[in-house]
Amino acid sequence: SVLRTGSAGGAVRLVQQKLNSLGERLKDDGKYGAATAAAVQRFQRRNGLTADGSVGCATWEKMF
């Protein structure tokens, strides 16, 4: 399933931790808020993905 603003849980925490390992400074609380969405957009732009701020299959595969 797609992770987006409003999502919560372990998968969101995993994304936050991965983004932090790449230089972001997110609170890894498992809550997908505006800061996480903005960090995901930066990741997507850096990796040639559609920068929609949501973590779907393509973003997940590139991230992990």
Task: Give the ranges of each region predicted by the language model.
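Acidic, Ser/Thr/Pro/Gly-enriched interdomain connector segments
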Residues: 1-30
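Intrinsically disordered, low-complexity Ser/Thr-rich linker and spacer segments
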Residues: 1-2, 62-64
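Conserved hydrophobic/aromatic packing and binding residues within compact polymer-binding modules
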Residues: 40-43
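Terminal recognition/anchoring or ligand-binding modules at protein termini
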Residues: 51-53, 62
